[in-house]
């Protein structure tokens, strides 16, 4: 894994208790207040998914709705506004389409890594949820996860013992 610049990222700002319009951006940096809650209180969530080019040339995105649901679950846990599933899907589909030229060919075994990120950008000192957030999605091509192919390992799972429990 590594970062390689692509053409575009997409962003949706949350202000005044509502999500704004989807914005297309080519800038790689995010202007941020030094008291942003993501910096001081960890008010941040991210997902990771991939787009693959099939043998037929069609682009397929792995587990899109499941990633949206997991991000929403994280948001509930750390008091961030949930991005609706349809908005999540809209952002992912848009950024993949805009950067389609970076999706590796089927034969390579590689993919386009998709990183959705939601951060608290509102300035806040004290443990309180931010009033402003940024949802941003960027992509980068990545090689196969198992470079030498997938092979099994001779490990045994022992279910009777747990290192963190008595007798473990």
How should these model regions be labeled?
Residues 1-168:
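Conserved alpha/beta cores of soluble small-molecule-handling proteins
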């Amino acid at each position: 894994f590594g970062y390689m610049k692509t053409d575009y990222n997409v962003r949706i700002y949350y202000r005044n208790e509502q999500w704004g319009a989807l914005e297309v951006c080519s800038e790689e940096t995010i202007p941020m207040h030094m008291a942003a809650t993501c910096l001081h209180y960890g008010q941040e969530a991210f997902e990771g998914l991939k787009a693959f080019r099939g043998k037929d040339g069609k682009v397929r995105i792995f587990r899109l709705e499941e990633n949206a649901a997991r991000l929403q679950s994280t948001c509930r846990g750390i008091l961030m506004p949930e991005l609706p599933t349809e908005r999540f899907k809209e952002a992912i589909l848009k950024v993949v389409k805009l950067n389609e030229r970076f999706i590796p060919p089927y034969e390579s075994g590689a993919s386009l890594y998709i990183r959705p990120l939601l951060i608290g950008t509102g300035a806040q000192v004290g443990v309180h949820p931010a009033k402003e957030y940024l949802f941003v999605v960027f992509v980068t091509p990545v090689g196969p996860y198992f470079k030498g192919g997938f092979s099994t390992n001779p490990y045994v799972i022992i279910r009777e013992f747990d290192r963190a429990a008595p007798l473990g």
